[in-house]
Swiss-Prot record:
The species this protein was found in: Brucella anthropi (strain ATCC 49188 / DSM 6882 / CCUG 24695 / JCM 21032 / LMG 3331 / NBRC 15819 / NCTC 12168 / Alc 37)
Residue sites binding NAD(+) per the record: 12
Sites where the protein binds substrate: 98
Stated name of the protein: NAD(P)H dehydrogenase (quinone)
UniProt lineage: Bacteria, Pseudomonadati, Pseudomonadota, Alphaproteobacteria, Hyphomicrobiales
Family indicated by similarity: Belongs to the WrbA family.
Domain Flavodoxin-like: 4-190
Alphabetical keyword list: Flavoprotein, FMN, NAD, NADP, Nucleotide-binding, Oxidoreductase
Residues annotated as binding FMN: 10-15, 78-80, 113-119, 134
Annotated GO CC locations: membrane
Region entry Disordered, spans: 157-185
Cross-referenced Gene3D superfamilies: 3.40.50.360
Biased composition (Polar residues): 163-177
Length: 199
C-alpha cells in the first residue's frame, strides 16, 4: 500500500476542506493517507484578529518527514499568484532532502485556493510544481481527465495542472461540491498512479 501525505496551508479553512477531500480520494484509491499542515508564521494575536481558522485538527509537519511518503499532495492558499509564504517557508527548508535526493521519483501534486477567479491560481500551481521538479519528483496533475472542471455556467474550480477553489476576498465562498469532488478525483488519481509506479 502506497503512503500519501496531504500537506496543506489554510488560513481560513478553504484548503483544509480541499485537503480532507483529496485525502478521501487517495484512500478510495487504495493509499494509506496522512494529512498534515505547515506551521503558521503569522503571530497568534494577528491571526486571531484576522479571523484565521486556528482550530484545524491536522498536526504540524516537519520537512524531514516528507521522505517517508511515496506521494505528496500540496494544498496552499495563493498570495499574489504564488504559494503562501507559510508553504514556501516550509519547502525552503527541504534543502537537506534535495542534497540527498530523498524525494527523487516520488509523486507530487498540487491544489490551490485564491480569493478571486483570476487570482493567480494557475501560476501558483505551476510554481509549486517547479519546487517539486527541483526535487526530482514526478508530477501528477489533475488533468482534463476530470470533466467536472468543464463549463462556464457557474464558478468552477480546476485547471489541467491541479484542483482550485475560489474563496472570495472576504473568505465567504466555501469550496463547492464540484471543487471538493475535483480534489477527491485528484487524490484518487495520485494514489492510483503512485501504486502503478511502485509496483
Amino acid at each position: 500500500m502506497v503512503k500519501v501525505l496531504v500537506l496543506y496551508y489554510s488560513a481560513y479553512g478553504h484548503m483544509e476542506k480541499m485537503a480532507k477531500a483529496a485525502a478521501e480520494g487517495a484512500r478510495e484509491g487504495g493509499a494509506e493517507v496522512t494529512i498534515k499542515r505547515v506551521p503558521e508564521l503569522v503571530p497568534p494575536d494577528v491571526a486571531k484578529a484576522s479571523h484565521y481558522k486556528i482550530d484545524q485538527d491536522a498536526p504540524i509537519a516537519t520537512p524531514a518527514e516528507l521522505a517517508d511518503y511515496d506521494a505528496i499532495i500540496i494544498g496552499t492558499a495563493t498570495r499574489y499568484g504564488m504559494m503562501a509564504a507559510q508553504m514556501k517557508n516550509f519547502l525552503d527548508q527541504t534543502g537537506g532532502l534535495w542534497a540527498k535526493g530523498a524525494l527523487i521519483n516520488k509523486v507530487g501534486s498540487v491544489m490551490v485556493s485564491t480569493a478571486t477567479q483570476h487570482g493567480g491560481a494557475e501560476l501558483a500551481l505551476i510554481s509549486t510544481q517547479w519546487q517539486m521538479q527541483h526535487q526530482g519528483m514526478i508530477i501528477v496533475p489533475l488533468s482534463y481527465a476530470y470533466q467536472g472542471q468543464m463549463g462556464n455556467d457557474v464558478v468552477r474550480g480546476g485547471a489541467p495542472y491541479g484542483m482550485t477553489t475560489t474563496a472570495d476576498g472576504d473568505g465567504s465562498r466555501q469550496p463547492s461540491e464540484q471543487e471538493l469532488d475535483g480534489a477527491r478525483f485528484q487524490g484518487k488519481r495520485v494514489a492510483e498512479i503512485t501504486a502503478k509506479l511502485n509496483s
